[in-house]
Amino acid sequence: MKPGKRTLRGIISDAMGVCADNKLLWTPDLPIVYMDNPKSGSTTIKNSLKQAQAAEYMRAGIAFRRSEEPHKADDCLKNRGLRRSACSHRFLISCVRNPFTRALSGYLDKVATRDPRYFPELRDRSVENFEQHLLAIADHRPKRLNFHFRPQHINLDFPNINYDAIFYLENLSAVSRFFAEMSPKITLETSAPHSRSANSKLRDHYTDRAVKLVQEIYAQDFSVFGYGSNLDDASVSPGECIVGGRIVAEGEEFLDMASRRPTRTASCKAFDATMRYHRLIDMLMI
């Protein structure tokens, strides 16, 4: 029997050493490539890029198609057609979030409000509260988790892929300053229609066991992104952003480092593999 598309992509992505459903998004006229990372400011970033690109089209008198849904690709924010050569003059960025608040936000948005059986990792499991949700995903292979629940270092393939900048949701002002430096045409348009105010609900859902489960499931996220593993520190940003694999301390100037000519992906084998994988998808080969 012929394997389904999801299964086939999983097999091929494993062989290539990439994540099967990571999402590279780009704008035709702006120097940004964004690696999607759900529940970590993705709606705000995508909406901002769409707004800026739409304004560019209108200034040039070019007709374009734009979806009001920020998560849907359109002429303003594309998920196909990016060529490796076009990345040499674009900045690769993403944004991360404290694992405690991100894990709870994913549960409140995607599980508590719908039938958990929608997600393969939760199928055949009793999921009546946040702790049971964590127990279910703890039993699942991390790379096969839905990317709302998956560890962020897998979504970003970090530190294998070299990013020009990785920002923190807890410090969105750094994103705003970066966008202003990259192009005066990009303004950070805060948008969070799927927000579940997870930060204010931590004590309502976190048991001692749930805390330990998040510390175990997302141990590498805490480590590589610099987050403290204490629940009381869930709203604290580790710094301004990550540039060149280094966490830039809060208050330290980072724009000069982050806004240099984007060359960090130039000799990055992990990024090359990701681009080849997306090329196969573009060509409808998988």
Where do the protein language model's features map onto the residues?
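Membrane-interface amphipathic segments in extracytoplasmic regions
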Residues: 1-284
